[in-house]
């Protein structure tokens, strides 16, 4: 279920404060955040935001196509390492 229209989009206040502080400066640094639930606003375009995946901060460069999505959508929290491969020596050929 999506968020109610009357509530509007959500973005963490500390993240908005960090974005506003860097808008005036020429050198844009990577902004660290733990807020995966924040919606990407048009003012975020052009910034690199390091989103926490539960283990480390993963840098994400924000483009126009990402506006309206959540930050957590672009950083997976689980890594799939594949299914276990059966050992050929232990399998029986038949009886």
UniProtKB/Swiss-Prot annotation:
Pfam families: Ribosomal_S19. One of its GO terms (cellular component) is cytoplasm. GO terms for biological process: ribosomal small subunit assembly; translation. The keyword Lyase does not apply. Gene3D superfamilies: 30s Ribosomal Protein S19, Chain A. PROSITE patterns: RIBOSOMAL_S19 (PS00323). It comes from the Bacteria. Keywords: Ribonucleoprotein, Ribosomal protein, RNA-binding, rRNA-binding. The keyword Ribonucleoprotein applies. InterPro entries: Ribosomal_uS19, Ribosomal_uS19_bac-type, Ribosomal_uS19_CS, Ribosomal_uS19_SF. One of its GO terms (molecular function) is rRNA binding. Belongs to the universal ribosomal protein uS19 family. Protein S19 forms a complex with S13 that binds strongly to the 16S ribosomal RNA. This is Small ribosomal subunit protein uS19. The lineage of its organism: Bacteria, Bacillati, Bacillota, Bacilli, Lactobacillales.
């Amino acid at each position: 279920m999506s968020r109610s229209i009357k509530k509007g989009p959500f973005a963490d206040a500390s993240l908005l404060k960090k974005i506003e502080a860097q808008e005036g400066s020429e050198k844009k640094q990577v902004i660290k955040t733990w807020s995966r639930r924040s919606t990407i606003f048009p003012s975020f375009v052009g910034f690199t935001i390091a989103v926490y995946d539960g283990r480390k901060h993963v840098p994400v460069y924000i483009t126009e196509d990402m506006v309206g999505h959540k930050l957590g959508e672009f950083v997976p929290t689980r890594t799939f390492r594949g299914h276990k491969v059966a050992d050929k020596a232990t399998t029986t050929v038949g009886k």
